Amino acid sequence: MLAGAEFTLYKNADCTDEAVKGITDDNGNLLFDKVEVGTYFLKETKAPAGYRKLLDPIKVEFKCVDGKHVFVVNDVVIDGNNSNENYSMTVENDWYIGNMTVINERGAKLPATGSKGTVLLVGSGIALCLIGLNKKRKNNKGEA
């Protein structure tokens, strides 16, 4: 459950025609209320500190197939027969509700810079270069 993630539902694949946006609550839930039948693209527009945004939008459709309302996620039909832990569809008070879990991952931890180890490595590299130059200089004097 991730609070503070911002998602936008777009009407086109280019994610330029905004339908509705919202921010996840303290429990990590977000409700887009009374969305019309159609095809949308869900994009994470802002991730909380320390987390990465989703790379690609998620295609979401609300439509009727053979007289049944269905919820379609990335071209996979979700109905009462094939719900799983990430996607499901329920009916409450004649409203069809598509439920979806979006997994956010923490950003990669960056290595520490400027540490004592870095100074030691750079110092060792410089020392080796100086030793090599000194040897070359001595060899050149011996040939003359």
Predicted regions located by residue number:
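Solvent-exposed loop/turn and edge beta-strand elements of beta-rich ligand-binding domains
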Residues: 1-144
